[in-house]
């Protein structure tokens, strides 16, 4: 939330390690910009900066707020064509809203990602004030659409473990949003119910900020 494609680039410090390991990093923006939708910049947790990696169905957002289609059907294929990367070894990870996106997109597009991980993700968006606000705005009262973009609900509906190689989630215990917005325990329970291996690592003293992100 509130971030751009530059936030991770300038604050996370991941480039050095990625260069050492031969990993290409792709940092997409978090929402459309410059669309001129009325009210798009009135709130920090909705509209600009809060795309939530979904395709909106409610007007006036439906035309431009199509982040899932942009990422999965435009940006990733274009990246694979333009750069010498191994498309069979693409992983996805994200922080907070980006963690929500990593988990939901990976489940909504089975087999697309070789690894899936998240840092302090919004893991049960329907239970979070952030998620309720965004889903109401982008989907209206279509609860079925809400459920299709809630990581815990999606996991609970899996007939078999979708990621047999396992999932990795890091979460700071001093995170001010942990109990109200993030709900990692709900996602962990959903994983347990479908026997999805997940490694949920809690870290004392770490909050929701970029010191946490740059550490793990």
Protein language model regions, located:
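Non-catalytic cap/lid and distal C-terminal segments of serine-dependent acyl enzymes
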Residues: 1-216
């Amino acid at each position: 939330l509130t971030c751009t494609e530059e936030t991770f680039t300038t604050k996370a410090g991941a480039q050095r390690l990625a260069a050492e390991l031969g990993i290409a990093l792709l940092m997409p923006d978090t929402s459309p910009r410059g669309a001129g939708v009325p009210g798009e910049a009135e709130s920090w947790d909705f509209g600009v900066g809060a795309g939530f990696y979904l395709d909106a169905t409610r007007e006036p957002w439906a035309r431009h707020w199509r982040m899932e289609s942009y990422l999965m059907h435009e940006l990733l294929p274009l990246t694979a064509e333009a750069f010498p990367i191994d498309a069979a070894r693409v992983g996805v990870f994200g922080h907070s809203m980006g963690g929500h996106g990593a988990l939901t997109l990976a489940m909504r597009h089975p087999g697309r990602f070789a690894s899936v991980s998240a840092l302090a993700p919004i893991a049960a968006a329907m239970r979070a004030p952030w998620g309720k606000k965004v889903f109401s705005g982008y989907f209206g009262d279509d609860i079925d659409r809400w459920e299709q973009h809630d990581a815990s609900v999606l996991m609970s509906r899996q007939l078999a473990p979708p990621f047999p190689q396992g999932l990795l989630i890091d979460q700071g215990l001093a995170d001010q949003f942990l109990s109200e917005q993030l709900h990692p325990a709900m996602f962990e329970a959903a994983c347990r119910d479908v026997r999805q291996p997940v490694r949920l690592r809690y870290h004392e003293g770490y909050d929701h900020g970029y010191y946490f992100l740059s550490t793990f």
